[in-house]
């Protein structure tokens, strides 16, 4: 096991010295960096490739000063402790898992202007565990660590070392050489340790890096534990012929599957044989160094050696001329490092593209921008206790999700008993489910994406695509047994959940993380096969309502937005109020009541599907994976399975009988749903009638939701009245709570304001688009060596979709708003070409073959309306045939097909 190597260094400002620090770390194979005097302000952290940083910055503000930081390799298992950031001391601690147990490490900086006592040093060290190494700039001198003269702080710290189990680890020589010639060398950089006496620890000073302090390297014979990497069964080193032949010889096709236990045994046999065959067919090789590391050429190594030689000479002579020579060598080295990194980066960009022949992938470069750094932060559990270890945080997440996967208790006891009684009634006999054919199974497997992560069985879609014909036949045999026995395998009911932090939410709260569930890939293949049969039954019987556009083939959000906007425009032309209610369903997919869902399945689908889906829902479990730890398993008492294929379909079935607006009472109403997004509109010339219509629907929807244990979040719902009049209808109440009445509401990603000007939506687009341009500036700027075609591809495929979404609807905005988007496109075109100010925007668009925003709106609108002509949903196809009255000079969505700047709209 490799020893752990720690760098201890007072950087005297680290931001400008990161290139040489990176070079030093690679040459000396450093695993942990303990930096002091980082000069970082606020939440600023030093960024080093392959390392994660935890800081304790000086809180006094003003000029950058002080500060400590610990940087740990991403691959090492660790967790941070609470930092100490006061004017008197800055301490950044973390715990690293090693072969000899957890060891605490801390980077410390003690400013020289404060007096210390032994008890104060003891207090800050008591925060650590039984084994720790705290190193940095203590500004304390004493003979214990080699100093000839002791100061007050050194005496206080030495008393702690002499009268406790704490030991000092120092080089015995000077570690600080002042820049001036008059100051004497100092002995103020060292480490305090505890519990590592039995471990061989060696410390040495290195004449490198550029500050008045020498870097210290601690070698600790306690190998660190790395995070386990996700196992990949099929790689480039896998011999597929060996893999397939091994599987064909181990999978028996004459297996008799007559019970649920037989199904579980068959799944276990299939999983184990696939794993063993893949491991047998994959040759193991030693891990190669990362290809994206910047190589260190011989010229830079010579400059480092020269700088080291000149610094050693100055440390001995302390002559100003030797100091000048050292500074010049340091400047040459820094310049060479910057130029070499820039040249390497330009060469890499020049060989980057979307073609298969390109050396580097353009999509990987842009994906790295989207990927957020996974910084570890401690969590607070329900008792207010801090949890820092991986296992502890995994258990906190699991406990939080276990509470979340519980049904609401909104239905009355009588309603619950009635539902249970109906569920217990005998089933009618029905035809069995049509068996699967091997060609069906093979077709579904081929269509699976290779980019999907596997479940707990680590069998990915690429592995399934490499299966031989005999394995496909065996899988078909198992699938048909599952359908025949109406038994869903036990192994497929376990989901591994990873938690993703929501931007802008507090890191210490479990509710600030979004769960992502990973299920076995083979189970998803089965779900896709059975989903095809369920969808055909639901469409034949008309179970899915026409107003539900979510999770349906051939449906999208733009069509539902079109329906809502058409109601608003019709109200404007008819001098009416269009009162709208946008409902927010609380944790819609996680709180589905299983008993109620099973009853609706029983009432709508044939009996064999009920038995199969009942087994599918019962006994489901989950565990949370957090870095290197996996929590204990918990039961799922509510909700549709996350990450599954059948989950969205089951939610649509669960909500298919929601109440409709009462058209006969108030008229001119519309209900639009997309998955769990519900919008209802009422049009009336009287604001009170419009409010009464919405209130009547809200009351009936609340009754229905309470009956089926569906929670409504009144505070997050919105009641917006779209009108050109000045009056506002009375507020709407849900469960005696008034619904907020803002001037705009976001529905399916588009901000709809009261007068439908789309000004707020255009402002939101510009904000997001400018932020994306800033993130991709290093790829798009004229100084980038990326080819012009690749820059244009980045804009078209990554940036432009931010404003193209919904342009068939928000394109109704006036020309001045559209030109605000066009202005950003003009700037991007000028950025990627580097053209001067006198080059016309029309010339840039013509030479780049880049369509204007107006042309793109026309093109997308034309395609959209052509699709509406052939749409299978009656409500969507009616959008093309309707001809509402036109009293105002406002555009309709169909007018965008031929729209151009400054065109007027004629009244019909």
From Swiss-Prot:
One of its GO terms (biological process) is DNA transposition. InterPro entries: DNA/RNA_pol_sf, Endo/exonu/phosph_ase_sf, Endo/exonuclease/phosphatase, RdDP_mobile_element, RT_dom. It catalyses: DNA(n) + a 2'-deoxyribonucleoside 5'-triphosphate = DNA(n+1) + diphosphate. Residues 481-752 form the Reverse transcriptase domain. Its cofactor is Mg(2+); Mn(2+). Its EC number is 2.7.7.49. Pfam families: Exo_endo_phos, RVT_1. Keywords: Nucleotidyltransferase, RNA-directed DNA polymerase, Transferase, Transposable element. The keyword Membrane does not apply. GO terms for molecular function: RNA-directed DNA polymerase activity. At least 30 copies of X-element are present in the genome and some elements are polymorphic between different strains. This is Probable RNA-directed DNA polymerase from transposon X-element. The gene is X-element\ORF2.
């Amino acid at each position: 096991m490799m020893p752990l190597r720690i760098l201890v260094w007072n950087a005297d400002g680290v931001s400008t010295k990161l290139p040489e620090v990176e070079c030093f770390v690679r040459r000396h194979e450093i695993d942990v960096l303990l930096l002091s005097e980082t000069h970082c302000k606020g939440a600023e952290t030093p960024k080093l490739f392959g390392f994660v940083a935890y800081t304790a910055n000086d809180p006094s503000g003003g000029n950058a000063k002080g500060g400590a930081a610990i940087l740990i390799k991403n691959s090492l298992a660790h967790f941070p402790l609470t930092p100490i950031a006061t004017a008197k001391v800055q301490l950044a601690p973390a715990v690293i898992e090693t072969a000899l147990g957890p060891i605490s490490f801390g980077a410390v900086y003690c400013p020289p202007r404060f007096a210390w006592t032994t008890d104060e040093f003891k207090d800050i060290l008591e925060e650590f565990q039984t084994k720790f190494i705290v190193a940095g700039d203590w500004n304390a001198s004493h003979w214990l660590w080699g100093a000839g003269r002791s100061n007050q702080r050194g005496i206080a710290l030495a008393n702690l070392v002499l009268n406790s189990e704490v030991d000092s680890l120092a080089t015995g020589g000077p570690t600080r050489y002042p820049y001036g010639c008059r100051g004497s060398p100092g002995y103020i950089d060292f480490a305090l340790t505890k519990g590592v006496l039995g471990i061989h620890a060696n410390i040495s000073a290195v004449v490198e890096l550029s500050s008045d302090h020498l870097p210290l390297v601690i070698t600790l014979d306690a190998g660190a534990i790395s995070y386990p990497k996700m196992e990949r069964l099929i790689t480039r080193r896998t011999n597929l012929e060996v893999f397939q032949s091994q599987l064909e010889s181990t999978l028996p096709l004459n297996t008799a599957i007559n019970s649920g236990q037989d199904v579980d045994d068959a799944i276990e046999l299939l999983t184990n044989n696939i794993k063993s065959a893949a491991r047998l067919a994959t040759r193991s090789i030693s891990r190669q160094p990362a290809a994206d590391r910047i190589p260190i050429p011989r010229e830079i190594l010579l400059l480092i050696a020269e700088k080291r030689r000149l610094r050693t000479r100055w440390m001995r002579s302390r002559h100003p001329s030797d100091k000048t020579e050292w500074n010049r060598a340091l400047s040459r080295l820094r310049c060479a490092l910057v130029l070499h990194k820039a040249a390497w980066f330009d060469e890499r960009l020049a060989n980057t593209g979307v073609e298969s022949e390109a050396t580097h992938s353009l999509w990987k470069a842009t994906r790295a921008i989207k990927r957020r750094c996974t910084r570890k932060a401690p969590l607070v559990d329900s008792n207010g206790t801090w949890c820092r270890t991986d296992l502890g945080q995994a258990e906190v997440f699991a406990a939080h999700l276990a509470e979340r996967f519980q049904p609401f208790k909104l239905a009355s006891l009588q309603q619950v008993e009635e539902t249970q009684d109906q569920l217990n009634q005998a089933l009618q006999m029905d035809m069995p489910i049509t068996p699967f054919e091997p060609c069906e199974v093979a077709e579904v497997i081929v269509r699976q994406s290779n980019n999907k992560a596997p479940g707990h069985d680590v069998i990915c879609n690429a592995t399934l695509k490499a299966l031989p014909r005999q394995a496909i036949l065996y899988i078909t045999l198992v699938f048909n047994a599952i359908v025949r026995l109406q038994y869903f395998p036990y192994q497929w009911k376990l989901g591994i959940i990873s938690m993703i932090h929501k931007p802008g939410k507090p890191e210490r709260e479990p509710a600030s993380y979004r769960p992502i569930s990973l299920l076995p890939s083979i189970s998803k293949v089965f779900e896709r096969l059975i989903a095809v049969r369920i969808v055909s039954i639901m469409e034949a019987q008309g179970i899915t309502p026409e107003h539900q556009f979510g999770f349906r083939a051939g449906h999208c959000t733009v069509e539902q937005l079109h329906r809502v906007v058409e109601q608003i425009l019709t109200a404007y032309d008819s001098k009416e109020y269009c009162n709208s209610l946008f409902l927010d369903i609380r944790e819609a997919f996680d709180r589905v009541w299983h008993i109620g869902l099973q009853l609706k399945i029983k009432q709508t689908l044939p009996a064999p599907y009920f038995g199969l889906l009942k087994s599918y829902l019962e006994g489901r479990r989950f565990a949370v994976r957090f870095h290197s730890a996996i929590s204990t398993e918990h039961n799922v008492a509510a909700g549709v399975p996350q990450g599954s294929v059948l989950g969205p379909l089951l939610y649509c079935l669960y909500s298919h009988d929601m109440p409709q607006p009462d058209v006969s009472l108030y008229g001119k109403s519309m209900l639009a749903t997309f998955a769990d997004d519900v919008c209802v509109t009422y049009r009336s010339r009287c604001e009170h009638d419009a409010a009464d219509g919405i209130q009547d629907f809200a009351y009936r929807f609340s009754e229905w939701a309470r009956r089926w244990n569906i929670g409504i979040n009144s505070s997050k719902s919105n009641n917006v009245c779209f009108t050109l009049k000045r009056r506002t209808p009375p507020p709407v109440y849900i469960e005696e709570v008034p619904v907020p009445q803002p001037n705009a509401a976001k529905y399916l990603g588009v901000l709809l304001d009261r007068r439908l000007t789309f000004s707020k939506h255009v402002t939101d687009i510009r904000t997001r688009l400018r932020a994306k341009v800033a993130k991709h500036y290093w790829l798009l700027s004229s100084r980038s060596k990326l080819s012009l075609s690749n820059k244009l591809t980045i804009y078209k495929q990554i940036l432009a979709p931010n404003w193209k979404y919904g342009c068939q609807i928000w394109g109704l905005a006036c020309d001045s708003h559209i030109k605000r988007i066009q202005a950003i496109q003009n700037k991007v075109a000028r950025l990627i070409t580097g053209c001067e100010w006198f080059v016309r925007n029309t010339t840039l668009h013509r030479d780049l073959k880049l369509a204007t925003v107006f042309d793109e709106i026309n093109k997308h609108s034309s395609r959209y309306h052509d699709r509406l002509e052939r749409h299978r949903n009656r409500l969507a196809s009616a959008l093309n045939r309707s001809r509402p009255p036109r009293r105002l000079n406002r555009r309709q969505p169909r007018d965008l097909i031929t729209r151009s700047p400054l065109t007027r709209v004629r009244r019909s």
